[in-house]
Amino acid sequence: MVNSMPKPFLTPGTLYCGAAPAVISTVLGSCVAVCLIDRHNRAAGMNHFVLPHNPAGEDSLRYGDVALDRLHARMGELGCETKDLRAKVFGGAAVLPFGATGDSVGTKNVKIAIEWLHAQGIPTLARRTGGENGLLIRFYTATGRVLVRTIQSAITIDLGGISPAFDSRQSPFFQE
């Protein structure tokens, strides 16, 4: 039953993985969320990262290279094998200003996610990336379905019963 399952809300720089059914939610602008699911092991997870990588090498889930590796590792701890994983990628909107040359932060975030998944051999089943509007994402881990709602600028969002992020000491949620 959906009402009794965990409903973690991911803030930037967090991830959630588990084998029990959950509804994982987040709100994205230029940030990216990658959802991984292993139907064989009935495990799933999602991250929410802010920037593609940190040139200083900071070990933080706010950076895509770290967040993707950690999500993959956590899925492995749940018994998942890379060959059984499937991905869905969301976010990366051009909501932050950037110079006339080069890609936006959102574009760079999407690029690192897609390249990382390709390098791992993890198929991407769905993708809603880019654009100019934010997204509200709800990932139903039991089925792998994702509800995506477009967020227009300057609106208030009622998250309707979604719990705020868990304390970072609670498993299976990680926050830095």
UniProtKB/Swiss-Prot annotation:
One of its GO terms (molecular function) is protein-glutamine glutaminase activity. Its EC number is 3.5.1.44. InterPro entries: CheD-like_sf, Chemorcpt_Glu_NH3ase_CheD, Cytotoxic_necrot_fac-like_cat. This is Probable chemoreceptor glutamine deamidase CheD. It comes from Rhodospirillum rubrum (strain ATCC 11170 / ATH 1.1.1 / DSM 467 / LMG 4362 / NCIMB 8255 / S1). Pfam families: CheD (PF03975). It is an enzyme of class 3 (hydrolase). Belongs to the CheD family. Probably deamidates glutamine residues to glutamate on methyl-accepting chemotaxis receptors (MCPs), playing an important role in chemotaxis. It catalyses: L-glutaminyl-[protein] + H2O = L-glutamyl-[protein] + NH4(+). GO terms for biological process: chemotaxis. Keywords: Chemotaxis, Hydrolase.
